[in-house]
Amino acid sequence: MAFSNNAYANELAGNGVMTFGAALRRNELDYSRFYATLPDEQARKILRDLGSERETLIEALQPDINEPEGFDKSRIPLTRAPKHVVMIMVESLSADFLGSFGNPKGLTPRLDEFAEKGLLFTQLYATGTRTVRGLEALTLGTPPIPGQSIVRRPNNEQLATLGEVLRPQGFEPMFFYGGYGYFDNMNAFFQGNSYQVVDRTDFPKASIGFENVWGIGDEFLFNNVLERLDKTHESGKRMLAQIMTTSNHRPFTYANGRIDIPSPGGRDGAVKYTDYAIGRFLDDAKNKPWFNDTLFVIVADHCASAAGKSKLPVPGYHIPMVMYAPKLLKPGKYKELVSQIDIAPTLIDVLGVEGDDHFFGTSVFEQGKNFQRRAFISNYQELGYFTQNQLTVLGPKQKVETFRIAKDGTATPAEINEQLRNEAIAFYQTAFKAFKNNELKYKK
């Protein structure tokens, strides 16, 4: 029972065990109670002025005669729209593991090759530090809300995910995972959002040449994925495949004889093995009839470590992404600041279909010169809004902090910029309420 207008005082005076139990059941920290807020209309106006106001899904899927959807060759660097998307979501792949970002160890020869032949995103930032945060961002295109990822929360079914948006437009959404999908509620989340779900329990035993407690070897995951993609392609459906790898994770073991680092090879060995497996997958895919019509997206779920001297060390969220489609895409680098939540609307934009305006994220190919380049980074409690050289952090007890971010990622306390403060609040407050009020539901 509340006795004060001060939420923090009420929490201190309450029954700690009961409060903790309730928080566990809800899997959330109530943004409206614990974080700085704005009037809802002011928050909506800020997002509208930033060009980031979400449309309802009905509006987003409704053709606009004044602004018809379709593949726009004038702003999208592909020769034509792909028919299929295969997204490889790589476990714990920090940008600084890649030679493309200056690593001298030679751990990622194949990824560096694809980066050279594809479109490399050099300033992409993950929203969090766990796989479920990455899946949330890449699938829902929403800023992280305090507490647990939406993937692990109750009432997370029938949301307007990337798959839900594409299914009625002729796509077969599929989620593949090399581990046990009940972990972190992955199976329930994707099944509840119209994805065909396939995890390690669905693969024939004879097809698994190596496995550990965390998952099957990535190469064997990809072998099984290829068979499923072939069958889906034969059915005549367009494909959206989201593949979550596992090998770049403790215990860092993998099949021997693939790379020059024997198993268990620690982090370096796991990164190099994952690189090998991805390279082999794409080599095999080149022989498939659907390859030339497919956009491959290689992106990390999060970094291997987000440790640092500050609460939200910006370099600990820097991840790589490569778009690869040798018959469709001109090689290059995209050097602007991008958030993980921008990937889903970008893919819808590239496919030339309806629905990208429903996401909080914005297609990178629609972000004009005046667009506020920003990224969202978080841990369980702190919510960061990063804009090139400044990080605004929202925390419990309505706390707001600002840091100047140097080129090497060093954070120095700075005076609060009211405009950026309000932008941060507008995004996080609106995202929290959208989920809580069922506004992210597909049929809302």
Task: State where each predicted segment sits.
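Solvent-exposed soluble domains appended to multi-pass membrane proteins
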Residues: 52-444
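N-terminal secretory/membrane-targeting segments
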Residues: 1-83, 115
